[in-house]
A protein has these predicted regions:
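Non-catalytic, conserved peripheral segments adjacent to functional cores
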Residues: 1-72, 90, 102-164
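Ligand-binding loop in jelly-roll beta-barrel domains
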Residues: 78-97
Length: 164
């Protein structure tokens, strides 16, 4: 239950080798990008981080195992960051998005930022990151650069969706 209509604007499919770490990704608010994520084949350790400045849970993270056995899914509201770690070769993640991909509005925070402290189930030397993700700023650097959404702005945006 999202509290508002989830208008799907784009569907993405990502296939990853074991050890591939993708994220932490997020889009500028508004409109940001809500996501509904599931793992079609294989398994991934899926992580959501609250990056909304001023939120009572700012900087906190939670995780769920998404796989082709239990068929769990996760919904990410606008203003949150997302990452996943492929635990098996050919792990396929499908995500439905509320806004189309807009590269100029997309940002990253390093998924290995010690200040966030995500407990990845593989040792750091086994993690494989893209160039973009490896060069991502820390949460503090992204905040100082004004890239992060605020709690107030995200709440106002979600409320505007409820009134539609």
């Amino acid at each position: 239950m999202t509290g508002h209509t989830f208008d799907m604007r784009q569907a993405n499919c990502s296939v990853s080798a074991a050890g591939a770490l993708r994220g932490l990704h997020f889009a500028q608010l508004p409109p940001s990008q809500a996501k509904y994520v599931t793992c079609v084949t294989g398994s991934v350790f899926d992580v959501v981080v609250d990056i909304r400045v001023g939120s009572p849970t700012y900087g906190h993270w939670d995780s769920v195992l998404l796989d082709d056995v239990d068929r769990r899914s996760v919904y990410l509201s606008e203003g949150l960051a997302h990452a996943f770690l492929a635990l098996q070769d050919d792990s396929m993640v499908m995500y439905l998005c509320s806004a189309p991909y807009a590269p100029q509005r997309e940002h990253t925070v390093t998924a290995t930022d010690p200040a966030i402290g995500i407990e990845w189930p593989l040792p750091a030397e086994q993690l494989v990151l893209s160039e973009r993700d490896a060069a991502a700023p820390s949460l503090a650097e992204a905040r100082a650069a004004g890239l992060l959404p605020t709690w107030a702005d995200s709440q106002a945006f979600v409320e505007s969706l409820r009134r539609r």
